[in-house]
Amino acid sequence: MQAIVLAGGLGTRLRPLTFNRPKALVPLLNRPQVLHIFDRLPKAVDEAFVAVSYMPDRVRDFFRETDLGVDVTVIEEEEPLGTGGAVKNAAGRIDDTFVVCNGDVIDSVDFPAFLKFHRKNKALASIALREVEDPSAFGVVAMEQGRITRFVEKPPAEKAPSHLINAGRYIFEPEVLDFIEPGRAVSMETEVFPRLAEKGLYGFPFGGYWSDAGTLRGYLTAASFLLADDGAGVDPGAKVGKARLDGAVLIAEGCVLSGRIGPDVVLGSGCRVDAATVERSTLMEGAQVEAGAVVRGSIIGEDTTVGPGATVEDSIVGDGARVRKGRRVIRERMA
C-alpha cells in the first residue's frame, strides 16, 4: 500500500522555529514531527511519498539516514501546489488504493477500521472526520448514511452544516487523481472534494484525540495527547535531584533539574531548569531556564536561555535566543 504525506508548507505558524528547519522536522516529544505521522500509518504501507517545498534537502537527508521499514521518496515542489497539487505530483507512481495524511495533524484515527469502512462502501474517496465545538476554521461536511453530500470550507459557525470537520486523513482510489488538474496549485478542500461529493465521497467519524500541530496551541495540545498516550518518561541519564515533577512529563538524557516541572512538559536532551517553573511547554535540546523564571504554554528553541526571573507565556522563542533577566514575553514570537 502507498501513502502520501503532505508536508509542503512553510511552517509560518511556528516561526521562528521554522526559520532553521522545515516543519516536518520540528521536534515533537523529542522526535521529528513527521515520524509521528509514520507511526500511525496502516501497517500495510510499504511505500510513502513526502511532498515538500521548503528545505527539501533537509527532509531528503533525514529520510536517507532514517530506516523506517518503508520506502520513502521525497517529492519536491518548486512552488507550493496546495493539497491537491501535491497529491497530483505523485500521480505517475500511484497504482492502487492509497492513504493521504496532512503532515500537521496528530491524531488517534484507527486506520484499519478506516480502511475497512472505505472498502465496505466501495468509496472513491473517504475522509476521516472529527467533531469539534467550533467548525468555522475547518472544512465541514453534511452527511447522509455515511456519504458526504456537501463539503463546505471554513463556513461561519452559524451556517456550518454540522460540527464534523475534515481531519486531514484520507483514503483514495487512483481515480481521484483524474479530478485534480495538473500543473497548478489545487486545493482538495475547495476544488476537489465538492466534486467528489457527487461521485462517491464518504466520511469516517472517529473519537479519541486530534490536533493541528502547526500552531502553538495545537502543538502543545498534540504534545499533551502524546504524553498521555504512553509518551511520558524520565531518561535514566537525567539528573532530577530534588526537582518536583507534576503530571505527565518527558525528560531526555543529560537534563539537570531542580525546579518545578509539569504538567505536560517535554525537555530535550541537555536541558537545564534551575529553581524555576515550567508548565505545559516544550524545551528543545540545550535550552536553559534560570532561577526564578516561569515558562508556561510555550515552546523554547534549541540552546535558548530564559534568564533569572523572566516570564515566558503563550509564546514561541527561537533557537539560540536569550530572554534577559526579568523580561516578560507574553504571546510573542521571539527570534
Residue ranges of model-derived segments:
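Catalytic-core segments of class I nucleotidyltransferases/pyrophosphorylases
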Residues: 98-99, 106, 112-119, 132-133, ...
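Conserved beta-loop-beta/alpha segment of the NTase-like Rossmann-fold superfamily
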Residues: 43, 59-145, 181
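Glycine-rich hexapeptide-repeat left-handed beta-helix
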Residues: 92, 273-335
